[in-house]
UniProtKB/Swiss-Prot annotation:
Protein name: Kunitz-type serine protease inhibitor B4
Disulfide bond sites: 31-81, 40-64, 56-77
Species of the source: Daboia siamensis
Reported function: Serine protease inhibitor that inhibits plasmin and trypsin.
Any one GO MF annotation of this record: toxin activity
GO cellular component: extracellular space
Keywords, ordered alphabetically: Disulfide bond, Glycoprotein, Hemostasis impairing toxin, Protease inhibitor, Secreted, Serine protease inhibitor, Signal, Toxin
Marked site positions, Reactive bond for trypsin: 41-42
Annotated Gene3D superfamilies: Pancreatic trypsin inhibitor Kunitz domain (4.10.410.10)
Transmembrane stretches, start-end: none
Pfam families reported for this sequence: Kunitz_BPTI
Highest taxon, organism lineage: Eukaryota
């Protein structure tokens, strides 16, 4: 196969991996956790995955502790937890 063909194949595989939906079996288990504000008293706007609505939603994080269902951006949450 030519180098151009290999690059095309690599590009298609990368695109497929990005666009393939996340199933419940592929979703990290921490996505199923309820949002946890943690033990500190900050008021940071963060994003968590809501298993019931299958959407990323806002919660307020204290700044320390908590769990891994805690994202800085909508895109990070969607890419990690939301099935498309």
């Amino acid at each position: 196969m030519s180098s151009g063909g290999l690059l095309l194949l690599l590009g298609l595989l990368t695109l497929w991996a990005e666009l393939t939906p996340i199933s419940g079996h592929d979703r990290p288990t921490f996505c199923n956790l309820a949002p946890e504000s943690g033990r500190c008293r900050g008021h940071l706007r963060r994003i968590y995955y809501n298993l019931e609505s299958n959407k990323c939603e806002v919660f307020f994080y204290g700044g320390c502790g908590g769990n891994d269902n805690n994202f800085s951006t909508w895109d990070e949450c969607r890419h990690t937890c939301v099935g498309k």
